[in-house]
């Protein structure tokens, strides 16, 4: 769950600059198989979760981490009264789930949508967003969809897949944009809901129409 209005735009830029490095996950996954990917992702995810545990239960470590990256953390991450996962932990959990659940092509696209669409939607939505759409801005959600279609087309070409595949993953992007806009009120972290919805809808369409993936 995120509310992008809770930190300054400059800090949002810095946060998303770090966030985009997660694109290394689908790029590297393109060149390796699922077991290898999971053997890398699972330990890294455990490390991020352990760091969150230290932040919550160890006051000295919490003070140190807040001093280093506190300006990039959202209020619900800083002012925690219960165990709260940071954005990095949610991204890593999402990566493991996406790679584990979905076929490789769909997983790569679903995770790319999470990283790129969420980033551009947040930045554009905060900069020019004026029209409310669920809990976000219409401008941000349209940016999410446009970037998503570009992502889907690019990966479809890389995978040498057909038009049905492109339509399926683009439809998944459409529903992911809606889910992202509603994630805050649904009390679901958008880092989880975006790839699960994008990948799930895409896979269902391809399964129903017996499409290639």
What is each PLM-predicted segment?
Residues 47-50:
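Central hydrophobic cores of alpha-helical transmembrane segments in multi-pass inner-membrane proteins
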Residues 1-40, 53-155, 163-213:
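Interhelical loop and helix-boundary elements at the membrane-water interface
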Residues 41-45:
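Short alpha-helical "patches" and their helix-cap loops
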